[in-house]
Amino acid sequence: MAHDFSPATSTEALVRAGQHSQLRHQEEASGVAGTGRLASTAFTIAFSREAGTYGAAIARAVGNRLGWPVYDHELLQRVAEDLGVHQTLLESIDEKHVGWLSECLESFSSAPTVSEFAYTRRLVEAMLSLAAHGECVIVGRGAAQVLPAATTLRVRIIAPLEYRIEAVGREHGIAREKAARQVEATDRERRRFIEEHFHFDPSDPTNYDLVLNAARFSQAECAELVIAALDRFRARHASSPERMQKAL
């Protein structure tokens, strides 16, 4: 029987191996190797967000409150350094599904390029490495789908479409029609990226621990709710680590 070594399959295998490696690292670091228990401080918050919800700003507010580093575009810098390319080279494929045709055409170019799969592989490795040490906030890029559920608080920020269009229009000083196109395009690209590489529907609320409507709460209130959820997440883990372990 032929084996499928497609980029998507390879990425999934990397994610699974990385998750188990991360948990072993955390057990060893906390002196509980082989017990099924995890280090009490090895938690990560992973944000997923619809376009125009100020998800990145909320994530930074959470990081500031906790004193944790926040990785958004900073992830691109880490991946660029690993690949030995300039960060701007990755921005055209960041959270986008470029497709095989684009990659084939780029292969004929003399300019330095990075394939979508190479970027995604290094991205997954970078996120797993960060989460292995815990106490960090990661924005987008499949973190909520990639990182182990047992040690990751997975947050989704949403809002009604009209709210998001108005937010993007204000932020960029553009007309409503252009803002609407930008919101639709960004949502589509992010969705395709997650579906193609990780086989998850990013809009499915069951993939998250907390879903917040940014139109109903201020950024500061959203940050407070996330931190409150983290406190409960930690408390539940402390009281029943075996139960949390089963979340994997």
Model-assigned labels for residue ranges:
Residues 8, 17, 100-103, 175-219:
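Small-molecule kinase domains that catalyze NTP-dependent phosphoryl transfer to phosphate-bearing small molecules
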Residues 200-248:
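NTP-dependent small-molecule kinase module
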Residues 56-68:
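A conserved segment at the C-terminal end of the G1
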Residues 1-42:
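Extreme N-terminal, non-catalytic leader segments
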Residues 150-170, 176-184:
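Conserved phosphate-donor/acceptor-positioning beta-strand/loop module used by diverse small-molecule
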Residues 37-53:
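Walker A (P-loop) phosphate-binding motif
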Residues 79-135:
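ATP-dependent small-molecule kinase phosphotransfer cores
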Residues 69-81:
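Short beta-strand-centered segment that lines the nucleotide-binding/catalytic pocket of NTP-utilizing
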